[in-house]
Design a protein with these regions (language model features):
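Helix-to-loop junction immediately C-terminal to a conserved catalytic motif
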Residues: 55
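ABC ATPase nucleotide-binding domain "signature" region
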Residues: 38, 135-140, 144
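Catalytic Walker B motif of ABC-type/P-loop ATPase nucleotide-binding domains
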Residues: 148-151
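The feature captures the beta-strand-to-loop junction immediately N-terminal to the Walker
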Residues: 40-42
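Short coil-to-helix segment of the ABC ATPase nucleotide-binding domain corresponding to the Q-loop/switch region
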Residues: 84-91
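Conserved ABC ATPase "signature" region
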Residues: 101-119, 171
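Conserved signature/switch motifs of ABC ATPase nucleotide-binding domains
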Residues: 122-125, 143
């Protein structure tokens, strides 16, 4: 058993149903502080339900969810306010700081972190998809957040932009470490980002394989660790012999 002081999130024998539909079955897991845990599995297996349970948006039908730290969620489609500028959207995540000079300093630091200097007064519709997701990420990092729950945050972007966003996320985490639970259908993304991958079964979801990716980030997509992780995920999902 891991030291409880090092665990940010955990499920203890969690099951969840929507009416007669059993989505999760007796699921137990732990997320370590500072870890990037990636969830992959068949469509509709309950990955987003797991994030909603971890965030506290829903309560489990059975079992216990434990949380230590402040949680922010990043979704597939950014939740930026279209009537606010980049700077104003980021400032919305800083309200907990209270002190205006401190907020201004933190906002400036975050804009520099996501490499959007000069775009502070632009509105979301004036930005590319990748730029909007960077603003969304900055807002999630703002304030006192310790944990990021990321629900397919790059899936709506084109392939080249997804690759760039993965590298951006790795760079940002080196400067601002966070605990991350990341849901994706993209096995390449999972192998490139994860410290640990949980491969989930079809509904009701159980953990059918746990994979540790013991290679520093950023990772070469043609490197042995990434290729072997991708191959194992494909086999577990029944997509490769």
């Amino acid at each position: 058993m891991n030291d409880k002081q090092s665990v940010s999130l955990s499920f203890d024998n969690v099951s969840h149903s929507y009416g007669a539909v059993n989505v999760l079955q007796s699921l137990s897991l732990e997320v370590q502080n500072g870890e990037v845990l990636v969830l992959v599995g068949p469509s509709g297996c309950g990955k987003t339900t797991i994030l909603n349970l971890l965030s506290g948006h829903i309560r489990p039908t059975q079992g216990r969810v434990n949380r230590t730290g402040n949680i922010r969620t990043v979704y597939q489609h950014d939740g930026l306010f279209p009537w606010l500028t980049v700077g104003e959207n980021i400032d919305m995540g800083l309200r907990s700081l209270g002190n205006q000079p401190q907020r201004e300093t933190e906002k400036k630091d975050l804009i520099e972190l996501i490499h959007l200097q000069g775009f502070e007064n632009h509105y979301p519709h004036q930005l590319s998809g990748g730029m909007r997701q960077r603003v969304e990420l900055a807002r999630a990092l703002a304030g006192q957040s310790d944990i990021l729950l990321m629900d397919e945050p790059f899936s709506a972007l084109d392939y080249q932009t997804r690759l760039r966003m993965r590298l951006e996320l790795v760079r940002i985490l080196k400067q601002r470490p966070r605990t991350i639970v990341f849901v994706t259908h993209d096995i390449e993304e999972a192998a490139q980002l994860a410290d640990r991958v949980l491969v989930l079964s079809s509904r009701p979801a159980t953990i059918c394989r746990e994979l540790h990716v013991n290679e520093q980030r950023p990772r070469d997509l043609t490197g042995a660790a990434v290729i072997e992780t991708m191959k194992t995920i494909l086999i577990e999902l029944g997509l490769q012999q």
